């Protein structure tokens, strides 16, 4: 079966594993998924991730993060720009997720970065997802 939106699949696998309180989840790898995983790690939403070679496209193993009492660090993930309806914004129109408590992941000419980094670099791009 052909996957039409691999980024939505990536976010859904993380959301489902998080809701089931799994320690980790394995996801087929791609460069944009590696970039998103790096952002989630840097912003403190996941513990870590590693890329394993499976003689095909590779697999990303994402290690989820929970609080001291088992509460979820990721409250929500939402895909914004979809294959059928792309969402591009200028640097001035970059969204703030929950008044700055969450992040927007933006694919720009400077790479895949957060909304805060895009504001600092004054670049717009495609809003990939919101994480809070």
Swiss-Prot record:
Coiled-coil ranges (or none): none
GO terms for cellular component: ribonucleoprotein complex; ribosome
Keywords from the UniProt entry: Ribonucleoprotein, Ribosomal protein, RNA-binding, rRNA-binding
Gene (UniProt): rpsH
Any one GO BP annotation for this protein: translation
Protein name: Small ribosomal subunit protein uS8
Gene3D superfamilies: 3.30.1370.30, 3.30.1490.10
Quaternary assembly: Part of the 30S ribosomal subunit. Contacts proteins S5 and S12.
């Amino acid at each position: 079966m052909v996957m039409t939106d691999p980024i939505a699949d990536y976010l859904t696998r993380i959301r489902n594993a998080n809701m089931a309180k799994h320690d980790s989840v394995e996801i087929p790898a791609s460069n944009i998924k590696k970039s998103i995983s790096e952002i989630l790690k840097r912003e403190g939403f996941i513990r870590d991730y590693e890329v394993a070679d499976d003689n095909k496209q590779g697999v990303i193993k994402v290690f989820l993060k929970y609080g001291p009492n088992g509460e979820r660090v990721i409250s929500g993930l939402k895909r914004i720009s979809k294959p059928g309806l792309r969402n591009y914004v200028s640097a001035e129109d970059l969204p703030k997720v929950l008044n700055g408590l969450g992040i927007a992941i933006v694919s720009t000419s400077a790479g895949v970065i957060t909304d805060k980094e895009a504001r600092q670099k004054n670049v717009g791009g495609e809003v990939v997802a919101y994480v809070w």
